[in-house]
Amino acid sequence: MSTPGAQEVLFRTGIAAVNSTNHLRVYFQDSHGSIRESLYESGWANGTAKNVIAKAKLGTPLAATSKELKNIRVYSLTEDNVLQEAAYDSGSGWYNGALAGAKFTVAPYSRIGSVFLAGTNALQLRIYAQKTDNTIQEYMWNGDGWKEGTNLGVALPGTGIGVTCWRYTDYDGPSIRVWFQTDNLKLVQRAYDPHTGWFKELTTIFDKAPPRCAIAATNFNPGKSSIYMRIYFVNSDNTIWQVCWDHGQGYHDKRTITPVIQGSEIAIISWEGPELRLYFQNGTYVSAISEWSWARHGSQLGRRALPPAE
């Protein structure tokens, strides 16, 4: 059975999440096309019609990034498939960001990935989306207007896009990793490091995934040329799978995590510990967003249904 609150959540909604340690924000689309925010501050709240931050085309992809929740950016598509930005800055609240004014039109089936560049106090952003020629395009904000960045090459039409960013303690700039799916259904990585720029090679992390499966990624504990990454995707068994990158081991440990509805979107956040929180739809109240939690003592389902579902 559903609940009145769950019925407000779009089935197969885009999902995005940001955090500052265990202060959490989750974004989703309601059945009328509005983007809402649910939050966790020692308890779950919001997610109602009073917590709308933007309006987007129905079925829009969602991506979000933040700097300690002082600056939050949430990305979606307009009815005309133009990239748009809902922006929050502490002290000024929510407003429409400058991105829509740049008029970057993407493929109607594009997904979105987004990151603030790590290791700098400056507000520098990178967005990844799929153009109508099916290439993955980077869009950059360095404080002086939105511009096109590097083109990462052709991907499967409608591919999921995962992205994460950190700064190694011994590097003088940010590192970026982007994951997407190729026409042969492999899940692949493109890598950027400050001393090399974008690596030309594609690194395969999974040989065959369902076409257009959702992809999400996070990292934790950046150190001296060392990083820990977790990449998630929805596999053909309708469960979320996790692929681990651990320092000294590379990619290893590919396993199923938790069941979801077919075609569920996913979002992942992490913080020191490490602590991981994964958001998805698994059929609870039909369309509620649910949470999976990982900490040192093990993994379990977290909140069964985020507000407004219950």
Swiss-Prot record:
Tell me the residue numbers annotated for binding beta-L-fucose 5: R230, Q242
Q: Please give the superkingdom of this protein's source.
A: Eukaryota
Give the binding site residues for beta-L-fucose 6.
Answer: W44, R277, E291
What molecular functions are annotated in GO for this chain?
A: carbohydrate binding
Keyword set, alphabetical order:
Lectin, Repeat
| Paired cysteines (S-S) | none
One Pfam family cited in the UniProt record for this chain: Fungal_lectin
UniProt: beta-L-fucose 1 binding residues:
R25, E37, W94
Q: Where is this region: 6 X approximate tandem repeats?
A: 1-310
Positions annotated to bind beta-L-fucose 4 = R177, Q189
Q: Tell me if Repeat is a UniProt keyword of this record.
A: yes
On whether Cell cycle is a keyword of this UniProt record, the answer is: no
sequence repeats: from-to residues:
1-53, 54-103, 104-151, 152-209, 210-256, 257-310
Give induction info: Expressed in iron-deficient culture, but repressed in presence of iron. Contains two GGATA sequences at -470 and -193 bp, consensus DNA-binding sites of GATA family transcription factor sreA which regulates siderophore biosynthetic genes and other genes involved in iron homeostasis.
Application notes: Lectins have particular value as specific probes for investigating the distribution, structure and biological function of carbohydrate chains on the cell surface of animal, plant, and microorganism because of their specificity for defined carbohydrate structures. AFL is suitable for detecting core fucose on cell surface glycoproteins.
**Binding, beta-L-fucose 3:** R126, E138, W198
Give the binding site residues for beta-L-fucose 2: R73, E85, W146
Role noted for this protein: Lectin that specifically binds to L-fucose and weakly reacts with mannose and N-acetyl-neuraminic acid. Has strongest preference for the alpha-1,6-fucosylated chain (core fucose) on glycoproteins among alpha-1,2-, alpha-1,3-, alpha-1,4-, and alpha-1,6-fucosylated chains. Binds to fucose residues of IgE in mice and human, causing antigen-independent IgE-mediated mast cell activation and anaphylactoid reactions in mice and is possibly implicated in allergic response to Aspergillus oryzae in humans.
Report the sequence similarity comment from the record. Answer: Belongs to the fungal fucose-specific lectin family.
What free text does the record give on domains? Has six binding sites that are non-equivalent, and owing to minor differences in amino-acid composition they exhibit a marked difference in specific ligand recognition.
The name on file for this protein is Fucose-specific lectin
Which source organism? Aspergillus oryzae (Yellow koji mold)
